[in-house]
Every structure is written in C-alpha cells, then in structure tokens.
C-alpha cells in the first residue's frame, strides 16, 4: 500500500510522517529500492519489529533480570514454551509474538521498554530520524519545527 501511494505521489502521503518497519530497508526481506523521501522514518534495525523483540528475548539468559522466575511469573520457559526451537521464518515469529500479548504489557510496552533500555544508541538514532521527518513535514505544512535546523 505505501509503495503504491509513494509511487503515485498521493498528497496526503507526501505531507505526513510515514514510519515504516526497519526490515523495509533490508533488500533480502523488504521493499527493494525503498523510498528515501524526507518524510519517512524507519523503526530501528533492519529487522521486523517482531523479529527484533524475538531475538532480544530468545538471546537472554533465563536468569536475566527481565524474567520473573517466580512460580507464577513470566519466565523464559513460559515465553518460549510453544516454540522451544529458534524460529527463522517471519510468519512463525509473528505468530509467537501475537501469543505473547497477555504478558507483554499494553501495546507490548514491557518488551519495547526492555529493548529501548538495551539499545539506547538505536533509540537515539530513531528519535533523530523522526525529528528530521517531522521538521520536513512541518516546514511543508506551516507548523513549528522541533529541531534546531530549518529543512
């Protein structure tokens, strides 16, 4: 959908901030020749968000402070009980991710907060990219910018 709107230069699409998953930038998994439009921002890494979270959690030791290893807590074993082997296919990872909804917090906030804590540099890069996209759209549409520079 985004690719079609971009190619047809739909005004609403060009005058808004568009945030796409990071895997769009990965030529092996995403949108080859992705647009370099100034109103675009991409989520951190070149992975689908579900894969990014999956890899973080799967790579954690079961004694990591993230896990609540009490009897009724959310442990690594609970997280991966239906998927004990490492997943590689994105559809399987998305199914796993959907199954974590009850333990992940509102809008998966528990997972996202942990990822942000472990990846401050990636978070800062995303914030700067988002501000750049916002400022570009703000100048085009007559709003005040957030950054220090005019676009």
Language-model regions, residue ranges each:
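Acidic, Mg2+-coordinating catalytic modules of nucleic-acid enzymes
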Residues: 1-151
